[in-house]
Amino acid sequence: MSELTIGILGGGQLGSLLCLGAKKLNINTVIYCDDKDAPAQNYANAFIFGDYKDEIKIKDFINKVDIVTYEFENIPFETLDLINQFKEVKPKPAINKIVQHRLYEKDFINKCNIGTARYVSIKEKSDLNSNIKLIPGILKTCRLGYDGKGQYKLNNPSDIENLNIDFSQEYILEKMINLKKEFSIILTRFGH
């Protein structure tokens, strides 16, 4: 039996793959997920169903694991920060705060001298009219958008008038570019 137990927040496809990989290395896994039907529970050594903001269940989870990771970026920052006070969270919560907000993520990538499509923060409909030069473009929610959710294609300026969206949340408008290929890349480092 393994001496190491990894706690995984989220129970989807990536959590399932992580559990399968850990099993090959004789590492135990505990899944914590807000979906009682999460597929990763079928591959984990243990499964805890609960809301990501339920401190009692989160503390129970903390007591069962040695280190914690997460399989998707929309885990509340406060939850990761709480866990990190007791067990190491990888990637660090501060990283997650960046990747779960599209504008922070783009700004961070640009500060690393990596090019992106042109973009601008949109807080109200008039901001769209002030940034016509970025149309055609994609208007995206800054938070909680994935797989096309929270995205609105603007082919021409007249599409702005037809938008029926809630401007109580922040958006990002990205200039459409002609892609030849799209890659998803994960970088990691071990140690310092």
Language model regions located:
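ATP-binding N-terminal substructure of ATP-dependent carboxylate-amine bond-forming enzymes
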Residues: 1-100, 104
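Active-site nucleotide/adenylate-binding loops and adjacent lid/helix of ATP-dependent enzymes
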Residues: 98-192
